[in-house]
Amino acid sequence: MTDEPALESAALPVLCLENTSAVYAGGVVALSRFNLEVQAGEFCVILGPSGSGKSTLLRLISGLVPTSSGTVTIGGIKMAPPTRRKARQRLGMVHQDHGLIDRLSVLDNVMAGCAGSLPFWRLMLRMYPRPVVDAACQLLDEVGLTEAQANRRARELSGGQRQRVGIARALMGTPLLILADEPVASLDPQTSRIILALLRRAAKDRGIAVLCSLHQMDLAREFADRIVVMRNGRPVFNDCPAELSGFLERSAIPPKRSGAA
């Protein structure tokens, strides 16, 4: 576990994209001159149809997709050589497929979230310092998992429980920013609300910026501080949930309910 990272300046947004583009082989434009800022403590939701660029956007922010132009900064640190590693240390990820190691215990999966701050031999032998174990147990308690569940293998948990573990693991590295890529895509509406409430609470209680992609418009309205709607690799709406209805009426995009596929 690392010390809480600090912004280089209190005035800076946690996440900043400036005129950022991503072009794939063959000239396919995945993102085009994308501008976005997310502040500390803000829960921002990305909406858009399949192929609009939501996943590409999150992969670009995390450094997995290179920028063709423009910049991505996390806490004032550029997600580009030579500072990419430092920028990634300020980032936590919550994946659609949980991203857990099934054969490891729930507790071990959470402690793996601080892998970047521990010697490699400790990770290989799973010999974690006592403060790391205590912090992981505290996070599991915060996301609603018991001590008995902490000692079970990850594969024994339900989908909702596994996603709780994913959130705890993302918080383990004391990030400035959490990226959540369709974190409730395979969950029922009730469990989806529990998971999104945990992410929102992380933003508010810890001052973390959270950027979350969803396809359920009603859940975005319920939980988001701000909604960004994407179309063809560009943002076409960037405002508070209260303004979304007017945008939908003007653009004739039908809302998708949380129970829909």
From Swiss-Prot:
It is a peripheral membrane protein. It is an enzyme of class 7 (translocase). It catalyses: phosphonate(out) + ATP + H2O = phosphonate(in) + ADP + phosphate + H(+). The keyword Membrane applies. One of its GO terms (cellular component) is plasma membrane. InterPro entries: AAA+_ATPase, ABC_transporter-like_ATP-bd, ABC_transporter-like_CS, ABC_transpr_PhnC, MetN_ABC_transporter-like, P-loop_NTPase. Transmembrane segments: none annotated. This is Phosphonates import ATP-binding protein PhnC. The gene is phnC.
